[in-house]
Amino acid sequence: MILAEKLFKCFKQKETFTLQDAYENNSDKPKETIRARIYDNLGIRFIRLAKGIYRTIDSYEEACILLEGDGRELSMFEDNSIDCILTDHPWLDMKSNKGGTRAFAVYDCFKYSFEDFKEKARVLKEGCFLVEILPAENENNYEYLYQIKQYAKEAGFIYYSKVTWKKGSFVSNTGRKAKNTQDVMIFSKGKARSMRYDKKKSNVTGEECYMSGCNGMLPTMFNVQPVSKKDRIHQSELPVSLCEQILQFVTYEGEIVLDSFAGSGVVGDAALRIKRNCILIEILKENIEKIKRRLGNNILFQPVME
């Protein structure tokens, strides 16, 4: 039996396996040979989910893994290894995150730097999409929101579109005006890949043709009610239906989505529901336990670093 086939049979019933697992199960073979057989069969027998973490292609249709760590540190990922980044970073805005005697953000917050976008561009595949969930513009954050776009541009991203997330009937009466929106900011790494069906060209050629852009015309807005206080497990938890809608525009089934600031784990939940693979990164122990409880009964979920 050839080594690649042996590795496949050994791990096909497991959700994920590591290089160390492969070494231990084939101790009679040099580590360099084992790595080479896995690399030679990427896309054939194996798929790489993260650096040193793999699964067999037909073990399950999708997988979700949870990494404990800093979401700004992406060095564990190979270049051009991710099909989509969808994230809602805990943005620092000391004024907007307070109202009266209330503090709305109780977790660690920060502001993006150019290095953050440089790393996002490194791990994302050419033409694929970066989706950032951002606050609505106000007098306190407009400069930062502009800076984010500049960082993205300098890192090689192209501004694709912005779609408003209207939070259903919810209205927040804080600040200078009532608020009920956030922004879904979409960038592509270089020219957007061809996901958009070209009806005119398809009719002329008699074949399915696609042009540069998302998988369909983006809506005027995403009108989705936010998660209720009694149901949410994280202060800034996104609705799973919002994440599903976004992912259907920017990914295909079987692709790998990265959420580097997982929070409640909702992006992983949404990805699995619509047959996408997902990698979640979360730094807070409290949130990691919540994600485990949320997805722990899902046979496609595997926390790999604790």
Please name every model-derived segment.
Residues 296-306:
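Class I S-adenosyl-L-methionine-dependent methyltransferase module
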Residues 2-288:
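Core catalytic lobe of class I
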Residues 291-292:
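Conserved SAM-binding loop
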